[in-house]
Amino acid sequence: MGNCVGRQRRERPTAPGHPRKRAGRNEPLKKERLKWKSDYPMTDGQLRSKRDEFWDTAPAFEGRKEIWDALKAAAYAAEANDHELAQAILDGASITLPHGTLCECYDELGNRYQLPIYCLSPPVNLLLEHTEEESLEPPEPTPSVRREFPLKVRLSTGKDVRLSASLPDTVGQLKRQLHTQEGIEPSWQRWFFSGKLLTDRTRLQETKIQKDFVIQVIINQPPPPQD
């Protein structure tokens, strides 16, 4: 597993089964987003695959599964700019951060856990792609009484936005509504709920979202072209 450095590394995680000397300090999680560049430009789908592979295999390198689960939830919360939630998750699991980042963490037994930077933020050279899902929008449901409700989404900028939604709506439709309201291109948006990425074809009713729940929207806006 790679440390938090400017480029990704192909290293396996340090097995935390053998406790190392724990750092003597614990710093709060820093709010700055880590910046890094991939060895090769990767698509959003490739980034998701790398993350899934890591989270699926990390517990196999010993350590405590509940700590890995907490780190995963904290990483998603931090990426969605919900640092209060991320810090609460870390505190609840008694996880300490010697340097204020999720790159290096310790549990209460002194076991060390390292997260690769690609699990904490997307690379600056991430390729934004228009997926087939965007062009193959599922057919509209049979017309019926539309029961709308206010859907709260929290942007990675920290702003909360309310959309008018109904359970049969797809994420792709709601992305376009957010674009109309806030001017954020649908291809820049990545929607997360309960730590899971929502695809454009996912309907709200499939997410089992309830009243007053919040969907996290991470915005990956491409940098302006350089002269």
Swiss-Prot record:
Organism expressing this protein natively: Bos taurus (Bovine)
Coiled coil spans: none
UniProt domain Ubiquitin-like: residue ranges: 149-224
Region of interest: Disordered: 1-36
Position of the signal peptide: none
Function of the molecule: May be involved in the regulation of cellular senescence through a positive feedback loop with TP53. Is a TP53 downstream target gene that increases the stability of TP53 protein by promoting the ubiquitination and degradation of MDM2.
Protein name (record): Ubiquitin domain-containing protein 1
Subunit structure: Interacts with UBTD1.
Pfam families per the UniProt record, alphabetical: UBD, ubiquitin
InterPro entries in alphabetical order: DC-UbP/UBTD2_N (IPR032752), DC-UbP/UBTD2_N_sf (IPR038169), Ubiquitin-like_dom (IPR000626), Ubiquitin-like_domsf (IPR029071), Ubiquitin_dom (IPR019956), UBTD1/2 (IPR039869)
Gene3D superfamilies hit by this protein: Phosphatidylinositol 3-kinase Catalytic Subunit, Chain A, domain 1 (3.10.20.90), Ub domain-containing protein, DC-UbP/UBTD2, N-terminal domain (1.20.225.20)
Top-level taxon in the UniProt lineage: Eukaryota
Positions with biased composition (Basic and acidic residues): 24-36
